[in-house]
C-alpha cells in the first residue's frame, strides 16, 4: 500500500517553511524514487569551472520513499538539502559523523548505550531532546528540524509521531532502509542508506566514497567466508540478559541481523525473539555458536554471563559451550542499523573462521 503525503495546510508560516525548505510536495510530475533507487542528480556543466571536478550535485526537488512502523510506503520530497536534522538513534548519529554532517544535527534522542569512541565527543556536544520513552513530537518540532532520521519502528502514532503526523508539523522523515522489518534486508541496506543520505544532503561524493569502502569490507568478508566455510552452515543463537539460568533471544525476524548471519553462512536457530528462556531451551536449541549481546543497563549480569554458562553442567554437551564458541558483542554494534555493524561482521568472521 502506498500513500502520498500532501502539502501542509496549517497556515502561512508553515506553508512558507515548506516552500522554502524541505517538505512533502503535491506534484504529480515529480519523479518518485525509493531510498535504494537512483535519485535524479546533475553534474556541473562542462562550461563551468565546477565541471573541472567530478563532484556530483543533487538536483532538487527529489522525492524519496520511506516507511514508518506500519511499513506503508510514504513519499518525502526535499526541495533543498536539509540544514537542520534530529537523529533518533545511535546509528543515525554515526552516519552523520561519517558523512561530515555533524553540524546539521540540532537535536538527538538520548541513546541507551555508550557512544562509539570516534563520535563520543560529538554526542556529548549534542542537544538531548529526551529519551525514547518520553519524547513527544511537540518537543521534536520545537527544535525546528527539517528532517528526522531513525529506524522505521520509531515512527508510530503516539509519543514520537507517525510519518504523516511529523509531516503535518513541517518535518520530513527518513527511516533507515536497514531497519525495515517488512522485507529481507542485508548489509547492503546500510550502504544504500549511506548513498541515499548523500543524495538528500547533497554530499554525494563523500557518501559514494564511504559506500565504496563499506562495499569493499563486505566483499572481503564474503570472500573469506566462501573460502573457509564452503557448504558448511553454522547454527547460531543470539542471546542477551542471561541471569540465573534464564535469558532473552533475538530471532530470525530481526531482519538486518539475520542478513548479517546469512553473510557469515550462519542460521539463527530461533525464528522469533523471546524472553524467559531456560537452560533446557538452550540445550534443545543446541547451537554451534552463541552471540551474546551486551548492554550498559545489564553491565553487572553481563560481566559474569558467559562464565556462568560455561559452569552449568547441563550445558556441557552444547557445541557452543563445549567448543568455547561464545562471543560478546555490544548491542548497538549488532542490533542497530549503522556502520558499526560492519565492525561486528568482521569480528564475527574472524571469530568463526580463523
Where on the chain are the PLM-derived regions?
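Short helices/loops that flank or line small-molecule/ion binding pockets
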Residues: 77, 136-147, 278-286
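Bacterial Sec-exported substrate-binding components of ABC uptake systems
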Residues: 2-4, 8, 20-94, 200-238, ...
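Structured C-terminal subdomain patch of bacterial secreted/periplasmic proteins
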Residues: 184-201, 208, 291-354
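Alpha-helical, coiled-coil/dimerization segments enriched in small aliphatic residues
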Residues: 111-116, 248-275
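A short, structured surface patch at a secondary-structure boundary
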Residues: 84-143, 147, 151-153, 266-269
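Extracytoplasmic ligand-binding site segments that recognize negatively charged/polar headgroups
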Residues: 115-116, 152-161, 171-196, 230-256
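Bacterial N-terminal signal peptides
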Residues: 11-18
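Solvent-exposed loop/turn segments at secondary-structure junctions
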Residues: 91-94, 111-114, 147, 153-157, ...
Amino acid at each position: 500500500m502506498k500513500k502520498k503525503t500532501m502539502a501542509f495546510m496549517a497556515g502561512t508560516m508553515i506553508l512558507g517553511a515548506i516552500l522554502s525548505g524541505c517538505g512533502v510536495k503535491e506534484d504529480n510530475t515529480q519523479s518518485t524514487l525509493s531510498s535504494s533507487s537512483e535519485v535524479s542528480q546533475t553534474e556541473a556543466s562542462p562550461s563551468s569551472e565546477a565541471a573541472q571536478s567530478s563532484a556530483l550535485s543533487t538536483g532538487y526537488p527529489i522525492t524519496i520513499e520511506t516507511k514508518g512502523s506500519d511499513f506503508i510506503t510514504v513519499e518525502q520530497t526535499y526541495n533543498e538539502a536539509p540544514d537542520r536534522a534530529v537523529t533518533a538513534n545511535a546509528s543515525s548519529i554515526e552516519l552523520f559523523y561519517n558523512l561530515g554532517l555533524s553540524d546539521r544535527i540540532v537535536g538527538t534522542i538520548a541513546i541507551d548505550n555508550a557512544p562509539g569512541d570516534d563520535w563520543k565527543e560529538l554526542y556529548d556536544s549534542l542537544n538531548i531532546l529526551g529519551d525514547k520513552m518520553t519524547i513527544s513530537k511537540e518537543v521534536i518540532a520545537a527544535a525546528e528540524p527539517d528532517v528526522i532520521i531513525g529506524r522505521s519502528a520509531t515512527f508510530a502514532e503516539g509519543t514520537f509521531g507517525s510519518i504523516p503526523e511529523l509531516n503535518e508539523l513541517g518535518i520530513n522523515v527518513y527511516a533507515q532502509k536497514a531497519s525495515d522489518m517488512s522485507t529481507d534486508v542485508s548489509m547492503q541496506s546500510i550502504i544504500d542508506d549511506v548513498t541515499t543520505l548523500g543524495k538528500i544532503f547533497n554530499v554525494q561524493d563523500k557518501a559514494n566514497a564511504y559506500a565504496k569502502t563499506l562495499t569493499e569490507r563486505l566483499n572481503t568478508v564474503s570472500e573469506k567466508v566462501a573460502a573457509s566455510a564452503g557448504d558448511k552452515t553454522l547454527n547460531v543463537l543470539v542471546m542477551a540478559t542471561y541471569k540465573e539460568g534464564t535469558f532473552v533471544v533475538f530471532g530470525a525476524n530481526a531482519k538486518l541481523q539475520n542478513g548479517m548471519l546469512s553473510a557469515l553462512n550462519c542460521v539463527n536457530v530461533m525464528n522469533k525473539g523471546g524472553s524467559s528462556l531456560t537452560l533446557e531451551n538452550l540445550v534443545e536449541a543446541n547451537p554451534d555458536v552463541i552471540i551474546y549481546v551486551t548492554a550498559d543497563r545489564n553491565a553487572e549480569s553481563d560481566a559474569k554471563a558467559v562464565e556462568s554458562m560455561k559452569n552449568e553442567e547441563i550445558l556441557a554437551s552444547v557445541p557452543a559451550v563445549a567448543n568455547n564458541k561464545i562471543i560478546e558483542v555490544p548491542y548497538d554494534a549488532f542490533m542497530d542499523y549503522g556502520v558499526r555493524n560492519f565492525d561486528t561482521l568482521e569480528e564475527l568472521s574472524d571469530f568463526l573462521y580463523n
